[in-house]
């Protein structure tokens, strides 16, 4: 949300609106990110942007929802590539989200030993910078410079092209890396198993979600998705161990 607010402030847009959209649009993220989203979409229609809207409309405040403006809700729903936000603040959030993903995923890959700075093509480093932070700063400044006094939020052709090449590089060398892919497959399996368990054993759901089953006409599968989508990575692993991994026998 900080990147979105920084860009919105520099462009003299509504900073609070940009931050509200940025904070709200991640509420529907599942444990293990896109792997968790894929797992829930495999077993039940699930989209994290739609889930984010569901959280603020139907789940918060004991099911009463939040009284958000149309502009915030529009930005939350349309922050993905397929959507088109109707405000400049929504467009700022959508673009800054892409920049944040590149920054964090590359930083994680370098820290995890999957990549080194030297692996990144020299021409991309020449344009964007020689560190994760430098690349993020380059892209943020480029967005601000090229969007100032414009009717759309965009980057310069050179930096935009470099960013897309960097994302392509990340897909080929990180997201499709056998080590990362193996961990993703484990996460998909685990979330799928949890979903099946809770659908069969709704008594294991927390009271808030059991009450939702009785008091609303939402499908059982939707309520289970609501619960799982709100888990952290570590909590999902904990519940998986609780239900599927036998404890050591005390003899």
Name the predicted role of every residue range.
Residues 1-16, 46-251:
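Histidine-centered, transition-metal-coordinating active-site segments
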Residues 21, 26-62:
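A generic, well-ordered mixed alpha/beta core segment in the N-terminal half of proteins
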């Amino acid at each position: 949300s900080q990147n979105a607010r920084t860009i919105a402030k520099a462009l003299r847009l509504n900073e609070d609106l940009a931050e509200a959209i940025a904070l709200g649009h991640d509420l529907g993220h599942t444990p293990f990110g896109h792997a968790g989203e894929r797992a829930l979409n495999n077993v039940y229609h699930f989209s994290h942007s739609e889930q984010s809207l569901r959280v603020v409309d139907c789940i918060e405040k004991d099911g009463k929802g939040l009284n958000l403006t149309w502009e915030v809700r529009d930005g939350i729903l349309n922050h993905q590539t397929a959507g088109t936000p109707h405000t400049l603040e929504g467009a700022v959030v959508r673009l800054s989200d892409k920049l944040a993903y590149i920054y964090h995923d590359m930083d994680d890959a370098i820290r995890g030993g999957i990549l080194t700075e030297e692996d990144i093509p020299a021409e991309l480093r020449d344009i964007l910078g020689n560190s994760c932070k430098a690349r993020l700063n380059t892209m943020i400044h480029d967005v601000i410079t090229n969007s100032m006094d414009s009717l759309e939020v965009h980057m310069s052709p050179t930096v935009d092209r470099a960013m897309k090449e960097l994302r392509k590089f990340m897909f080929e060398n990180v997201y499709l890396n056998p080590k990362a892919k193996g961990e993703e497959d484990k996460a998909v399996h685990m979330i799928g198993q949890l979903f099946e368990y809770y659908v069969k054993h709704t008594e294991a759901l927390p009271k808030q979600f059991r009450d939702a089953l009785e008091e609303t006409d939402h499908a059982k599968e939707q309520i289970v998705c609501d619960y799982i989508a709100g888990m952290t990575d570590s909590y999902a692993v904990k519940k998986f161990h609780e239900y599927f991994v036998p404890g050591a026998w005390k003899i």
